[in-house]
Regions:
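Outer-membrane beta-barrel strand-turn architecture
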Residues: 32, 82-86, 144-148, 189-192, ...
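Residues that define the transmembrane beta-barrel architecture of outer-membrane proteins
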Residues: 34-36, 70-74, 130-136, 150, ...
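Transmembrane beta-strands of outer-membrane beta-barrel pores
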Residues: 44-48, 96-100, 144, 158-164, ...
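Glycine- and aromatic-enriched membrane insertion/assembly motifs of diderm outer-membrane
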Residues: 57-114
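Transmembrane beta-strands of outer-membrane beta-barrel proteins
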Residues: 36-42, 90-94, 136, 152-158, ...
Length: 244
C-alpha cells in the first residue's frame, strides 16, 4: 500500500509539473471561494477485514479463516464542503456502500485427505457476508496551488459507519457500528459548468467487529467457524468521482 501511495503522489506531481508549462484560460475561477457548496459522488469500493485467527481447536478441528479475493461494490453519497481558507476545506460526505465479503475457512492438516461416504472429510468451508454500510466521514481537505484547470489535493479524517445489511444466522456476524480513520488523494478538474474530482481513499476501522455472542446460531455445527476467529477489523479502498 505504501508503494501504491508513492506512485500516486509521483503521478500527481508529474501531472502538475507538465500542466505548469503553459497557462490556459481558467474555468470557474472563483469556484473555490464559495463559503459552502453541495455536491454528490458515485464510485466503486472493495471491502476487506483484517482477521486474527485463534488457532484453537473446536471438537478436535482447527480452522483458519481468510478473505481471498475482493468483490467490487457500489458507493453513492452527497458532499457538503465548507471553505476554511485558500488551502483548507472541511468536508462532510454521508455515503452508502453496497458490497459483500467472502470468507473461506480451511483445515490445513486435512487438505488432501480423502474421506469415505460414511466419513466425509471437510477441509474447506466458504460463506459470504453482505455489508451495506452507511458512513459519515468528516475530513479535512488540503488543496495544492491551482494550475490552469487542475488542483490536486490530500484528504484525511475520521468516520462512523452503520451496517444496514446485518443478517443473523450467518456463521459470521459483524457488529452494526464501526469507527475509524481515512486518508486519500484526489484532483479537482475545473470544467465549464462544474468540478469533476476523481478521488482514491483508504479507510481503516478501529473497532473489533466480530460478534462473539452467537446464541442466534441454531445449527451448532456452524459455531466452530466464528470460534476460529478472535478479532476482525475493517478496511476499505474507495474510488469515487465527485461532482460539485
Amino acid at each position: 500500500m505504501r508503494r501504491l501511495l508513492f506512485i500516486i503522489c509521483v503521478f500527481f506531481l508529474s501531472v502538475t509539473a507538465v500542466m505548469a508549462q503553459k497557462e490556459k484560460v481558467k474555468n470557474q475561477p472563483y469556484a473555490d471561494l464559495k463559503w459552502f457548496h453541495l455536491g454528490f459522488h458515485v464510485g466503486l469500493h472493495a471491502q476487506d477485514l483484517i482477521l486474527t485467527n485463534t488457532g484453537v481447536a473446536t471438537n478436535g478441528e482447527t480452522w483458519y479463516a481468510e478473505i481471498p479475493s475482493y468483490s467490487p461494490g457500489f458507493s453513492v453519497g452527497v458532499i457538503g464542503d465548507m471553505y476554511l481558507n485558500p488551502y483548507f476545506n472541511l468536508r462532510f460526505t454521508p455515503t452508502i456502500h453496497f458490497g459483500d465479503k467472502k470468507f473461506v475457512f480451511r483445515r490445513p492438516e486435512m487438505e488432501g485427505v480423502e474421506g469415505t461416504d460414511e466419513n466425509p472429510v471437510v477441509s474447506m468451508y466458504s460463506t459470504s457476508v453482505r455489508s451495506n454500510y452507511l458512513t459519515f466521514p468528516l475530513d479535512v481537505k488540503y488543496s495544492a496551488f491551482r494550475v490552469n484547470n487542475y488542483r490536486p489535493y490530500l484528504i484525511g479524517g475520521i468516520y462512523g459507519a452503520f451496517d444496514l445489511g446485518r443478517k443473523k444466522g450467518n456463521p459470521i456476524l459483524l457488529k452494526g457500528t464501526d469507527f475509524g480513520v481515512e486518508f486519500g488523494i484526489g484532483c479537482d478538474i475545473y470544467l465549464p459548468f462544474f468540478k469533476l474530482c476523481p478521488e482514491l481513499k483508504f479507510s481503516f476501522g478501529l473497532v473489533d467487529l466480530l460478534e462473539k455472542d452467537r446464541s442466534d446460531l441454531t445449527d451448532l455445527e456452524l459455531i466452530k467457524y466464528p470460534n476460529s476467529l478472535s478479532k476482525a477489523t475493517s478496511r476499505m479502498v474507495t474510488l469515487t468521482f465527485n461532482f460539485a
